[in-house]
Amino acid sequence: MRTLPQSLCSSAVVAAMLCVLPLTLQAQGPAPTQTPTQTVALTATIRDPAIVPTDRLSVPWWAQRHQAILDSLPSHADTELLLIGDSITNNYDKALPPNEDFQPIWQQYYAPRKALNLGFSGDTTANVLWRLDHGEVDGLHPKAAIVLIGTNNTGFFHETAEETETGIDAVVKDIEHHLPETKILLLGILPTRLPSKDLNFDVNSYLGSHYAGGEDPHVTYMDISVIFYQGGSLNDSIFYDPYLNPPRASLHPNTLGQRMMASAIESTVARLVGDTPIKPLPVSLPASPQP
């Protein structure tokens, strides 16, 4: 007989949804070894999409990026830092028209730490879980991992705050399973003008109460939302979405916003990695785009 591991029941949300009535399976002979997310997936229902490891292999660029990361792992055996997330993390690899080039930020803050970018545009917690369980961190021993995930759960897949919270909890547990010596810097979902902004606030409130108290010694939680506000309002000038044609709701930091974000977390990253903080370059805020 098998039940959901107690380690996963430490999450209040997982406990409420999954651990009150433990899953019971009839097992013949020794049970196969399972990752935390594989075990959680056995209990998941259609109401729990954020914790079911899900691939996007039908999307050509996604499958190619995943394979490229697997192929590159031997050359990243000495990486000190992982960045795990969605398009906001993926953007460090990109130069976006008309004038967004994120590579200088990567070269300043992360290349010296031999960092590996595990950001995939459009990913949810479910996709991150699948990637973790399908080799993307195999053989690695990073000192720290920066995790920023969840905005696609609420913003584009219309998952609830509770589902997204459970998904983020599952990502944390899965990283701890695969990389037990790695320290995790968990970032709150960044602010946005999408209708999901209130859900994101609820998610961040949960993450702050759940992780900020030091209950999980592997996790440091930071909510850096304040840097994206000016005069009490979201500063659209540091997102690139309003400058697209047609304009879109602010979601992705532009080059300036990304640099501000890297600067805001730098002292914590340096502490987790065990090196000297990198001095930020001065920045000046442009005027907000006109509607």
Where are these regions (language model features)?
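N-terminal secretory targeting modules
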Residues: 1-84, 88-107, 271-291
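Oxyanion-hole/transition-state-stabilizing segment in secreted/luminal serine hydrolases
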Residues: 90, 94-104, 125-169, 174, ...
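Extracytoplasmic/secreted proteins, especially bacterial periplasmic and envelope-associated proteins
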Residues: 83, 123, 127, 163-170, ...
